[in-house]
Amino acid sequence: MTMRLLWILLSLSLLSNSVFADVVIEGFKMPESVIEDKDGNIYVSEIGERDVDKDGKITMIDKSGNLTTIVDDLYDPKGLVLFDNKLYVTDRDVVVEVDIENKTSSVYAGTMQFPRSPVFLNDIDVDDKGNLYVSDSGDFKSTGQIFIIKTSGEIETIFEDERNLIKAPNGLLLDGDALYVLDWAGEFFEADLNKKSFKKIAEGFNGGDGIAKVKDTFFLSSWLEGKLYKLIAGKAELINDKFEAAADISLSQDNKKVYIPDMKAGTLTILDVI
């Protein structure tokens, strides 16, 4: 048994026993996103080496600490979301569907299906019907856009009228009829999907990446600054500034822990938030 596996087993044991402890799991290659399923399995997207094609993969950590590669033929996998026992992953300019049980992947939404060619597909979320919302960070300056991939296969650009506000959308979070957007430029927006309204609710998160939410509390990560924030009623509080590149965060199923992939450090940190 490797030292890495022993450390993961110890970490998961601490978590399962509700011991207040921050856990750091090492050994990933540019981890970008993370998500936990209802059974407690944790999935991590790993971009792999820079400028190397087809070395990206999805790794699963089960409750016993065993690591399994689900698929390993991706380019630069980033955002992850689970729906109907499948993983949906942004991978450069396509969205990939991953069959976890069979360990296979296929293109769910190809480049040519988008109304405008995507440049840098980044985060992804899903509604209760299976429609996917995907951010395209573009050139990280002013060409970003947000897509909806409907279950019918139709893809639309949404919030076209707000493109002067949306510079480089990164993190996405659906909460009922609200879509929250964290822009790379550091601004945090709330969009009403029914009223088609769009408003800024906070700013100052330079290199904004991931979003998580527990009741009225948001957790926001800054990739550029290596920071994790807590946001309540528009007021931000710094939780941790020790990361090298805090990427796409998520919550545990019980909403008591936040998972933070650190892309540059190659780690997954698990912090108690309750």
Language-model segment annotations:
Residues I61-G65, D99-K103, I149-E154, D192-K196, ...:
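Short loop/turn segments that connect beta-strands within beta-propeller blades
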Residues W7-S16:
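Bacterial N-terminal signal peptides
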Residues N17-A21:
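Sec/Tat signal peptide C-region and signal peptidase I cleavage site
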Residues F28-D39, S45, K54-D55, V71-Y88, ...:
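Beta-rich, blade/repeat-based domains predominating
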Residues A246-I274:
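Blade-level signature of beta-propeller repeat domains, shared across WD40, Kelch, NHL, RCC1
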Residues G48-V52, V94-V95, G138-S142, G186-E187, ...:
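Short glycine/acidic-enriched loop and turn motifs that connect beta-strands
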Residues D22-I25, G65-V71, T104-P115, E154-E162, ...:
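A short beta-strand motif characteristic of beta-propeller blades
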Residues T59, V96, F147, F189-E190, ...:
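WD40 beta-propeller blade core
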